[in-house]
Amino acid sequence: MGCSAATFILVALFGSSSWMGTNSVWMQLPLLTSELPEQWNLPSYLAGVVQIACIVPLIYTILHKGVKSFTIPTAPLIIALLSLACCCQLGLSFFWSDYSEIFGAPRSWPLYSLLFGLAIVNAMSNVLFMPFMAQFHPAYLNAYFVGMGLSSLAPSLLSLAQGTSMFKCDEKGVAERFPPNFSVSIFFFVIFSFTCVALFAFIALYRSGAHTHFATPNKKEPNEGTPLKKDLNNTSSSRKGDDEDESPIEIHETGAPAIDAIVSELDVTFREELQKSFRDANYLERSAMINDDSEPHPVDYITGVKFTFLLFTTALVNAQMNGIITSVQSYAALPYSQATYHFAVTLSNVVSPLSSFLPFFISVRSIPVLAILTACSTAMTAFIVYLAALSPNLIFNSVTIGSALSIGGSLIAAGLHSYLRVVFASLLREGHQSESRLFWCGVFIQIGSFIGSAVMFPLVNIAHLFTSAPQCKSIS
């Protein structure tokens, strides 16, 4: 069966919904911090909300793996989640600026609630969307990962077109604001429209039956993301008959991948590894896509101490990326200008998906080299924290130098973190128990992200170790 251009586009649009909601809120932080009462503390609150929401897919996977009677049809659940994302995105366009007093302080609870809903949808995409794509021809994985890249790139480009809220200081030291090219409400409404397109694309994709063209004939659960082990064995035995050389593969009944809630841009690496898993599971053999005599190349799998090291560094990198930097970046950039924060956040989200493609060209397997790169990313994170600790003072007492260092540090950190995250997941994915290894990779991703946010939240909001700078400040 050939690949359809229409199906390719539908899959890409469907994949774009994976993390677009959360990314869209993050792209608006430079404007939200200037409008909402939490001000510079807002990013740390939102990071905590996202991490709490990421517990939901973990619970889902535990139930799906541990409770055999727990079954929910995949496609209807995806439609329900995308509908929830549309509702939350539409709600943001109207209620993002609302707040009320809770526990003696003004809180932007509508923003928290709506972001929580979006984060649930985005995190659940890792345990639902990927298994669903296992039912398609492997060539469509390219389209899905293109869509995942768009979920970060599209809000970033839209934010660049929007610009930021500039201001100038009058003689009395009062900031006079100039609005961006279009408002936060319009931004969220455009993202809402994009999410609706993704929802309708999935419905059209499912109704087209493209996923059934690659399904096994005797598959009993059409809504499962991947077939059960017994179905694989039955199909293989019925097709091969007396063939004794078939390689067994260990596939869990759920077919759910790891809970890698933040690792949404593992584009090329996951594509290659999933295609390899399709080949190992005789997907391609059953559909006559490859010859029976093809064999996977031997790989020096990561085990033992190296495996433990990779899990630890995975947690460390994600703690920095999803917990530490997101909590203090406002303090590291806003003292220099609103535009500095805007470009640091926006361009970082452009660099991240692009860096995820680097392992396709530059693959590193050496543990010492990976340790050095991890140390470099940690040093860059420490530099961003140092800039934040200087606030309201400026490094070298210079707006120009400070802005360049703040933006440059954010871009380098984002690039290193994204690259390392892909490489770690690729190495951990290798092996005969690939799903189990990838599951633990996802667990440590979430552990690292949670610890990073849990450590930074009290430091920012309770201990008040970081200080906001006044908008209008004389520079000597």
UniProtKB/Swiss-Prot annotation:
Swiss-Prot/TrEMBL catalytic activity: riboflavin(in) = riboflavin(out)
Which segments does the topology annotation call Cytoplasmic?
22-41, 97-113, 162-185, 328-342, 388-393, 459-476
Answer whether the UniProt record assigns the keyword Cell membrane to this protein: yes
Q: Which residues cross the membrane?
A: 1-21, 42-62, 76-96, 114-134, 141-161, 186-206, 307-327, 343-363, 367-387, 394-414, 438-458
Induction (UniProt): Down-regulated by high levels of riboflavin.
Q: Which keywords annotate this record? A: Cell membrane, Glycoprotein, Membrane, Transmembrane, Transmembrane helix, Transport
List, in alphabetical order, the GO biological process terms annotated in this UniProt record: IRE1-mediated unfolded protein response; riboflavin transport
Region annotation Disordered: where it falls in the sequence:
215-249
The chain's Extracellular topological domains, given as residue ranges, are 63-75, 135-140, 207-306, 364-366, 415-437
Q: What happens when the gene is disrupted?
A: RNAi-mediated knockdown causes a severe reduction in the number of laid eggs.
Q: Which Pfam families match?
A: SLC52_ribofla_tr (PF06237)
* Chain intervals with Basic and acidic residues compositional bias: 218-232
User: By its UniProt entry, which InterPro entries does this protein fall under?
Assistant: Riboflavin_transptr
Tissue-level expression reads: Expressed in intestine and pharynx.
**Family in the record:** Belongs to the riboflavin transporter family.
Q: What is this protein called?
A: Riboflavin transporter rft-2
The record lists the organism as Caenorhabditis elegans
